[in-house]
């Protein structure tokens, strides 16, 4: 291997693309940018896979109640978490912030506005949705799903251990000061269906069922 190859291997695709632009090589820069996206997605996907694997180990070794505790623990450490940030945002800013997150997740996003809420459709969500579509909960991997129903599973059974954190986000956004869950998740029963998420504009418009399923009461407004 010569020194030029070694140097290029050590450079990020972004740096290589910028160098190509400096040389006026537009097509080369475009190719490098596309490669950069593929490389990042590969690394991101591996990290998300690892989370579900770890939660499965926790559930099988210590009991699935510990999966809920582990998923909530991230909100107890001294780091700013998304649910804490968007709990204090206006709906429009929460939509902008959530779109930023899912662009980083490499999800396939559609955003629409309705009279009382914003709707985000992920087809798929590139984290839990992608892994479910790939069958990680089936043999030979058999990654975990809940056997019981809890507030941190929206009161439902058979929720993937990975997707638990979305219900926890709903709970934590209220516990961090929001009058209602900033983002409300409708995870599909069929993994081939999209994940739908709602950001309501006003607390009064949020159906009471969305509070009950996470063990909360709808405030009077």
Q: Which residues make up each language-model segment?
A:
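N-terminal accessory segment detector
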Residues: 1-195, 201-221
């Amino acid at each position: 291997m010569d020194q030029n190859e070694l140097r290029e291997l050590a450079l990020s695709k972004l740096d290589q693309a910028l160098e190509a632009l400096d040389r006026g090589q537009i097509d080369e820069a475009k190719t490098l940018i596309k490669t950069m996206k593929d490389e990042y997605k590969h690394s991101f996907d591996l990290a998300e896979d690892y989370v579900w694997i770890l939660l499965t180990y926790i559930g099988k070794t210590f009991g699935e109640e510990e999966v809920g505790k582990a998923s909530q623990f991230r909100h107890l450490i001294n780091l700013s978490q998304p649910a804490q940030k968007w709990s204090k945002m206006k709906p429009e800013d929460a939509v902008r912030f959530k779109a930023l997150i899912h662009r980083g997740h490499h999800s396939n996003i559609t955003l629409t506005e309705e009279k009382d809420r914003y709707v985000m459709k992920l087809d798929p969500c590139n984290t839990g949705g992608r892994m479910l579509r790939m069958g990680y909960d089936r043999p030979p991997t058999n990654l975990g799903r809940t056997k019981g129903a809890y507030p941190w599973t929206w009161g439902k059974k058979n929720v993937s251990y990975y997707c638990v954190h979305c219900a926890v986000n709903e709970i934590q956004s209220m516990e961090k000061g929001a009058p209602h869950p900033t983002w409300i998740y409708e995870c599909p029963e069929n993994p081939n269906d999209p994940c739908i998420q709602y950001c309501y504009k006003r607390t009064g418009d949020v159906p009471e069922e969305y509070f009950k399923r996470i063990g909360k009461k709808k405030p009077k407004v």
